[in-house]
Amino acid sequence: MANRPLDILNNALDTPVIVRLKGAREFRGELKGYDIHMNLVLDNAEELREGEVVSKFSSVVIRGDNVVYVSP
């Protein structure tokens, strides 16, 4: 059973996730990796603002201290 945040991230590998960042920014993409600082790597990512896609990236690295939540 996944109890710790990193367990949840491990279970979400290679699946689509939504990542909410400080400043009301969101990214949606396939979680490809993470580290103990919750730095995240998303493939086929889209940056969302107010629910609208504003940018697309083949791969993006998100710094962990900007992450508010990750929704699998």
From Swiss-Prot:
Coiled-coil ranges per UniProt: none
Source taxon at top rank: Archaea
Stated family: Belongs to the snRNP Sm proteins family.
Keywords assigned: Ribonucleoprotein
Keyword Ribonucleoprotein attributed: yes
Protein's organism: Methanosarcina mazei (strain ATCC BAA-159 / DSM 3647 / Goe1 / Go1 / JCM 11833 / OCM 88) (Methanosarcina frisia)
Domain Sm per the UniProt entry, residue ranges: 4-72
NCBIfam families: PRK00737.1
Record GO terms (molecular function): RNA binding
GO cellular component, one term: ribonucleoprotein complex
PROSITE patterns: SM
Residues of the signal peptide: none
Protein name: Putative snRNP Sm-like protein
Pfam families: LSM
